[in-house]
UniProtKB/Swiss-Prot annotation:
This is Small ribosomal subunit protein bS6. It comes from Christiangramia forsetii (strain DSM 17595 / CGMCC 1.15422 / KT0803). The gene is rpsF. The lineage of its organism: Bacteria, Pseudomonadati, Bacteroidota, Flavobacteriia, Flavobacteriales. GO terms for molecular function: small ribosomal subunit rRNA binding; structural constituent of ribosome. InterPro entries: Ribosomal_bS6 (IPR000529), Ribosomal_bS6_sf (IPR035980), Ribosomal_S6_plastid/chlpt (IPR020814), Transl_elong_EF1B/ribsomal_bS6 (IPR014717). Pfam families: Ribosomal_S6 (PF01250). Binds together with bS18 to 16S ribosomal RNA. Belongs to the bacterial ribosomal protein bS6 family.
């Protein structure tokens, strides 16, 4: 199993309930594909660097997880089909990125 991090941006016109429903849908999808969730972060509504689909902001979310390599392609296919999804990016984490992510989680936990 490899370590991955996925950041996705949801449409800013969604209600809180729709956002929670969408995030839960993709978390469940990953778990059904054999992934183990390491961390989830809700970065909230943020301004975009440039307009996407005529929108200037979006709700950012981050998933960090361990998954088999064949789980990523179906996830990204589902992202492409989702109307609520504006953008997404999945990266495979190397040992340095894993260490940095652990530091980030620890720092965020201390702030909370």
């Amino acid at each position: 199993m490899n370590n991955y991090e996925t950041v996705f941006i949801l449409n800013p016109v969604l209600s809180d309930e729709q956002i929670k429903e969408t995030v839960k849908k993709y978390e469940d999808f990953l778990v059904s594909k054999g992934a183990e969730m390491v961390a989830k972060e809700d970065w909230g509504l943020r301004k975009l660097a440039y307009a996407i689909q005529h929108k200037k902001s979006g709700f950012y979310h981050l998933f960090e997880y361990k998954a088999p390599g064949d789980a990523i392609e179906p996830l990204e296919l589902e992202f492409r089909r989702e109307e609520r999804m504006m953008r997404y990016l999945t990266v495979k984490l190397d040992k340095h990125a894993i260490a940095w992510a652990e530091k980030r989680r620890k720092r965020n936990k201390e702030k909370a």
